[in-house]
Design a protein with these regions (language model features):
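Catalytic cores of alpha/beta
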Residues: 52, 73-84, 136-147, 169-186, ...
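Conserved N-terminal beta1-alpha1 strand-loop-helix module at the mouth
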Residues: 1-64, 68-87, 142-143, 147-150
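A generic short alpha-helical patch detector that favors 3-5-residue windows
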Residues: 3-4, 21, 109, 121, ...
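Alpha-helix-loop-beta-strand connector modules within alpha/beta enzyme cores
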Residues: 45-70, 105-128, 132-133, 150-151, ...
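Hydrophobic faces of well-ordered beta-strands that scaffold small-molecule active sites
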Residues: 8-16, 41-43, 60-67, 93-95, ...
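Glycine-rich phosphate-binding active-site loops on the catalytic face of alpha/beta enzymes
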Residues: 64-69, 87-102, 150-167, 186-210
Length: 210
């Protein structure tokens, strides 16, 4: 599937959440998001109010993550963070699957975790949840997609990009598992327009860049 630069930008969530990401880098991300019309930005929680203010009146949304990098926060903590973000102007929410619970076979805990955030934000807020596919084999990816769909997500997302890259194979497995019941966001290690176009053919609707 061939797309223009503008079409690709409107599928991109620009992300800047690293531990050493600076305030100046956040301002530059916002500048680039406005210039290229990215779909959304996700930054450090301490700058959320400022990001919301600077993007008022633009076509760029502000997203927010409600989990630490491991996904192992208690469900109530994630739910409260999600509500806090919405109260401060965030328009989309991202969670990270509880990878420890998943690897432990605690499927009910995984679903409760995902569902707690959905219940906290309501049915109309776009909600994404990250698998961290680099930690999972194909069967685990398929099973994780089922649990996240059961928990009420709009998007299953490959990765944070901090643990390892997302590959075409990962996306193919996710696409086969989701069967259109959830949308797919790809992030981490996507370096060429050819890869983007092949991922689009597999059903990816949003990309993380940062």
């Amino acid at each position: 599937m061939r797309i223009s630069g503008h079409e690709f930008a409107r599928m991109c969530d620009a992300t800047l959440t690293g531990a050493v990401a600076t305030h100046q880098e956040m301002l530059e991300m916002i500048k680039q998001a406005k210039k290229y019309h990215f779909y959304s930005v996700i930054g450090q929680r301490c700058y959320l109010d400022e990001m919301v203010e600077k993007l008022k009146g633009t076509d760029v949304l502000v997203g927010a993550g409600c989990s630490n990098i491991t996904g192992a926060d208690p469900a109530e903590v994630k739910a409260n963070f999600a509500k806090w973000h919405l109260a401060h102007g965030a328009q989309e929410i991202e969670n990270i699957m509880n990878i420890s619970a998943f690897k432990s076979g605690l499927d009910d805990m995984v679903v409760r975790d995902v569902r707690a955030v959905r219940d906290a934000i309501g049915p109309n807020v776009v909600y994404k949840c990250i698998l961290e596919v680099c930690y999972l084999n194909d069967d685990e990816i398929r099973h994780a997609c089922e649990l996240l769909i059961e928990g009420g997500v709009d998007y299953v997302k490959t990765s944070t990009g901090k643990a390892g890259p997302a590959t075409l194979h990962h996306v193919e497995v996710m696409s086969e598992a989701c069967k259109g019941r959830a949308k797919i966001k790809a992030a981490g290690g996507i370096r060429s327009i050819e890869t983007v176009e092949r991922m689009l053919d597999l059903g990816v609707e949003r990309f993380g860049v940062g």
